[in-house]
Amino acid sequence: MRKLARESAFQLIYEYQFLKELNEDTKQALILRNKLDEDDVRYLDEVCAGVVRHYDELNQKLEGALDRQRPERIYRCDRSILLVALCEMLYMPEIPPKVSVNEAIELSKIYSTEKSGGFINGILSNFLPGGSDHGEDH
């Protein structure tokens, strides 16, 4: 199920922010626990590889979309959710951008603070077609 694969990707990227590498043991445990099928594992590999490959660029785009908040003040949980969603939006055209935004908000309801959903929605809306594209210039 894509929802569980996306949640697994979020968890791997959260861990990546600390370790600076994708942990294969964690990945295998998530695949088994969430009973991910072949398509889900393919998605998981694609999104995690995309975030790692474009990590600095994605972070710059996120920081460019901030209004007044200092980048280092973003909760790592929120940043992980944002990285997964933004990778989908920019590098995985088969996923509708609004789906990425909605799923990111849903993840924030489970893993982050009460206000995170609105924050995440505000940041990602900059990258929707017709959004302000703050991140594109930075």
What is each model feature region?
Residues M1-G117, N121-H138:
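N-terminal interaction/assembly modules
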